[in-house]
Structure formats: structure tokens, C-alpha cells
Amino acid sequence: MPLPPGLAERLQDPRLHAKVMGADEAAALIAVGANVGMSGFTGAAYLKAVPQALAARLAALHAAGQTQARIGLWTGGSTGPELDGALARAQGIEMRLPYQSDPTCRQQINAGHMLYNDMHLSHVAQAVWSGLLGHLDIAVVEVAGILPGGG
């Protein structure tokens, strides 16, 4: 599959070219029940396409009777409607951390349908490294580019 225009200049490690995929394919790599780290904080660099594809998949599973089809969602802080909102509307979040400000998340947390850890942002990294929060299964990050050595 040829890379979209301009992507080869940003994705400079040719070993990664074969891994380029659409949002639905990427979302399919996220297992139900996984603890998922997603990049972003407020409006900066939070994901939009993959969370919406994941939300659609989880909503379809819920409609088919698999009501436990949810993930743990770890971010750098509050994101936006395409991430927090989409996954919350799909009832796809089992546990959310740290800070969030999405109204649908807040409603589900207050109703006891979503677990929530309002840990201060400065404590999240140490809690993850120490295993206090369980295992981070997969991370999905938005980046501007990748250099030939992977940086």
C-alpha cells in the first residue's frame, strides 16, 4: 500500500512504512479489557480517529450483548469529545485516569458505571512504573514524525 502524500517525509524509518494502517485496523489491535494509554492533554495532540473507531467497535459489541466490552483508559489529562466523549458514549471505559472533564464521563463516574482515579498528574508516571495501576497493555500516540533511528 503506498503511503499517503507527505507521510514518507515524516515517517523516516522505512521499516515502519508497512505498519501504516487506517483507524479501524488500528482500533482492532486493542483488546477488550486492555489498559490503553493514549496521548494528549486538553486540545493538544489527543487522538481522534482511533478512539472513535474503537468506540464504534465497543458500541457494536455492547449492542450484541457483550456489555463488559470496555477498556481502561490512561491519558495525560483531559482530552476531548473524540476520545473521552466517544468512548464514554459507547460505554467503553471501565476505568479512567487521571483528570478528565468530559460531561459523559462525569455522568458515568457519578452513576457508578465507570471507575475513576483522580490521581494528580505528577504522580501518574511513578504509579505506572511501580505497577500500582496494573499493566499498560498498549499505547496509542499522536506524533509529528519519526526519525530514521526511531526517535
Where are these regions (language model features)?
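Conserved alpha/beta enzyme-core scaffold
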Residues: 1-151
